[in-house]
């Protein structure tokens, strides 16, 4: 028999759970305030201004030439989620927290670039058009803001473009050790990285013992990217391995890709719909040397009803790129329609985000 006290206890638990659920949903609904507040703090470079010291809002507002009271309210709000710390004794005086201290570093190989990228105003605003994207079936995040594509936005906003490509570089830096544990690139004479950004993947392979026998490394990307790489080199980057070169072009122009016996594509296919992925694969099939291989480094979405970052990337892909994150079955469906067959699917055990699909031409 269930006692009255048991019933009361269960009722209290249900009520507490309901309160937690309501608070959670409210927190999700107002999530844009957090991302916009963070975006604003990054715009004004507050983490860098604070450095290792405490500064008053009055001092910060004079440096930034902004309203002191509103700046205080911004930093006070961010301090409630651990970004910045307000002095317990003196009102309006802030210092960097453990979290905001991380945001001081925006070097090209730093993961922090992804924070800057995700909190950029145009990226945040693009999600205002998620409903339109769902309704019409094509990306509306950029076109609704007056850009023909995300690439046009990157071309116009050099800072955002740098954060985007630096984010790609940081992803490679995080994963290259695991990649080299599973793939020996010495079996290939030439490697082309399609959409290779700063060339971090090829440079890392060339430096490793698993790339010493490779004769040619070609980094293929858009002129905007390759031109920026040249500027970076002119600004002090040491001349790299003579086996390394770069080609400025577009994945979808009529010209062929550079010929090679190995092609790599790292987080490229998820930015395109199935038809464009098939177009790229068809072009590779016309340029790849006999017995060549293609390595696709990308997400393979797996769990259902669980917190999983690639599902959020998936929404970004449909809003901004007309792309998608794919399940293993979706990848198989694409490759069945292509000139390539799957040789191996490897879910890297030490990777937070990446799997490897190894392809070769169908006989």
From Swiss-Prot:
Binding site residues for S-adenosyl-L-methionine: 195, 221, 250-251, 266
Record field: catalytic activity: (3,5-dichloro-2,4,6-trihydroxyphenyl)hexan-1-one + S-adenosyl-L-methionine = 1-(3,5-dichloro-2,6-dihydroxy-4-methoxyphenyl)hexan-1-one + S-adenosyl-L-homocysteine + H(+)
UniProt keywords, alphabetically: Differentiation, Methyltransferase, S-adenosyl-L-methionine, Sporulation, Transferase
Functional description taken from the UniProt entry: O-methyltransferase; part of the gene cluster that mediates the biosynthesis of DIF-1 (Differentiation Inducing Factor-1), a signal molecule involved in the differentiation of pstO (prestalk-O) cells. The three-step process begins with the formation of (2,4,6-trihydroxyphenyl)-1-hexan-1-one (THPH) by the polyketide synthase StlB. THPH is then dichlorinated by the flavin-dependent halogenase ChlA. The last step of DIF-1 biosynthesis is the O-methylation of dichloro-THPH (or des-methyl-DIF-1) by the methyltransferase DmtA to yield DIF-1.
Induction (free text): By cyclic-AMP; this induction is inhibited by DIF-1.
Family stated for the protein in its record: Belongs to the class I-like SAM-binding methyltransferase superfamily. Cation-independent O-methyltransferase family. COMT subfamily.
Protein name (database record): Des-methyl DIF-1 methyltransferase A
Superkingdom assignment: Eukaryota
Protein's UniProt keywords contain Transferase: yes
Top-level EC class: transferase
An example Gene Ontology molecular-function term: 3,5-dichloro-THPH methyl transferase activity
Alphabetical GO biological process terms: biosynthetic process; culmination involved in sorocarp development; DIF-1 biosynthetic process; methylation; programmed cell death involved in cell development; regulation of cell differentiation; sorocarp morphogenesis; sorocarp stalk cell differentiation
EC number: 2.1.1.-
Active site: residue positions: 270 (proton acceptor)
